[in-house]
């Protein structure tokens, strides 16, 4: 069975200097915010999403290892949908798309 896969939306987290304005916001919180925004821009319902993939490099707390899962659940994606966090250093975002 073949299926067409489409990217309906993309949102990037902000970039800041180490220890500055974004230091009080965890990577999982940022990921949840961009997941919510990507879903809104795509005009789809969270329950219609069947997979979530995030690129992420530097873990600052234990739940960052599950960043994609944390963001998906926080954005209302069903817990039955797989979630994958990719760590390919500088290529993480691109690898997540592929």
List each model region and its residues.
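Condensing-enzyme catalytic core mediating Claisen C-C bond formation in acyl metabolism
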Residues: 1-26, 37
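Active-site loop-to-helix "anion-binding N-cap" substructures in soluble metabolic enzymes
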Residues: 21, 25, 29, 33, ...
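Short, well-ordered amphipathic alpha-helical segments that serve as non-catalytic structural scaffolds
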Residues: 28-43, 67-71, 96
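Conserved catalytic cysteine-centered active-site region
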Residues: 52, 56-98
């Amino acid at each position: 069975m073949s299926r067409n896969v489409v990217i309906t939306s993309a949102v990037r987290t902000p970039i800041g200097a180490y220890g500055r304005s974004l230091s009080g916001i965890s990577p999982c919180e940022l990921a949840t915010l961009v997941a919510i925004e990507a879903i809104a821009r795509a005009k789809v319902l969270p329950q219609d999403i069947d997979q979530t993939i995030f690129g992420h490099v530097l873990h600052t707390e234990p739940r960052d290892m599950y960043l994609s899962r944390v963001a998906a659940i926080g954005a209302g994606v069903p817990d039955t949908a797989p979630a994958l966090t990719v760590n390919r250093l500088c290529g993480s975002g691109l690898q997540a798309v592929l």
